Every structure is written in C-alpha cells, then in structure tokens.
Amino acid sequence: MPLYHVDPGSEAALVKVNDDVDLIKISVGTVDNNAYLIHPGAGPAILVDAAAEPGRLKALIGDDEVGAVITTHRHQDHTGALAEIVTMTGAQPWCGEPDAEAIEATTGVTCRTMWDGDLFRLGDVELDVIGLVGHTRGSIALRLHGNPSDHVFTGDSLFPGRLGKTSGSREFESLYTDVCMKIFAPASDTTVIHPGHGDATTVGEERPNLPLWRARGW
C-alpha cells in the first residue's frame, strides 16, 4: 500500500505526528499537488504549500487559526493559492530566501524568508529548515520531529524513487549532495518523506537507491 495516499479531489488524510501534533494531507490542483496542514493541539497551525484550490484549502482549515504559510519553492503549481490563502487567513507567508523575489513576482505576496540551518518556531511547533539547491535555487525542506518518526516535507526535491527534476548536471550534483548530506545522513530509516506530489515514502525505503540515482544522474 502507498504510504499516506490521497487521491486528487478526495478527502484529506490524517497522520499522527505525536501526541500533540496532527498532520493533515490533501491533494489539490490538476497535477496532484500536496498541501500539508501541521495542526498542533493548541496554538496556530502551519500550512505547507498553498498550491491550488483556495476554497478547498480554506475548508480544510475551517475556523482554525493559521499562523504561517510556508512555500517550499517558487514554481507556480506550489504557489497558485498563496495570495488567496494569505488574504483569507491573515497568515504570515514564508519561503526560502533565494526564491522570495520570484514568488513575489508571480503572486504579489512578499514572504518573510528562511534558509538552511534556521529553526522555525510557531507556538509549540518547531521545524528545521533545510536548503536544497537544485530543483530551484531556493528550495527548502522542513523537518518536523515526531514520535516515533520524524517527518520531512521535501517539496519537489525528493520523491519516492527519485530526486526532483533539475535543469542540468551541475544542478543535479548540487541537489544530490544536499539531499544525501542534509536529509539522509542525519535521519533514521523510519523518517517519513512527504513530497510535493504523490505518496509519501521513508528514508529507509529510499536510502538503498542513492547509488543508483547518482549513477543515472536523475
């Protein structure tokens, strides 16, 4: 069975991160974009990638407070509902610093910025910010510590069975190195990887594939 599978247009899936934090996953848009709502037991929620269908995202949020909308990278299939959701919720938008200018140009939204090594805190939720240069210059992943497993939101930088698309060999080398050193090296095999499209996977499932990815160059 695919891990945390959600069909496009279907109901959201609930994932227990720990006793205090839930994760809600929904697929929106025409290319199976994942949006993730990190929902603590108390305090404001965090939305990762306001990709599309602002009405469905707002229905998912309901009357809950959203304190931040974090965009994993600048591509428009991940920012299509950003302006509407920020307006609807009053949430603070965030993104990786190198992608901020491009996001503002396409959405009109000025994001506060984060980058590799930052610790993002909102209420009781803490996210390790991981810069992954390759799919875009400012792509980020977010590590949420859980029990029994950590959860990493990788945008379009890492998927089941492959890395994200890159525009050339230099970008691939950069992304491969960042993913190996910053995601796989410090992670346990039970760590769950939540990509920007499709099903989740685990570090343990993907770690044996790293030499293959390196050899084939994608």
Q: What is each model feature region?
A:
Residues 31, 52-53, 75, 99, ...:
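A generic "binding-loop/recognition-motif" signal
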Residues 38, 72, 132:
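Conserved S/T- and glycine-rich ATP-binding loop of Class I adenylate-forming
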Residues 2-5, 9, 16, 25-34, ...:
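Active-site-proximal loop/helix segment associated with metal-binding centers of metalloenzymes
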Residues 11-64, 141-155:
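Conserved beta-strand hairpin/beta-sheet module of binuclear metal-dependent hydrolase folds
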Residues 26-28, 111-112, 131-133:
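Short Gly/Pro-enriched turn/cap motifs at secondary-structure boundaries
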Residues 45, 131, 137-218:
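Metallo-beta-lactamase
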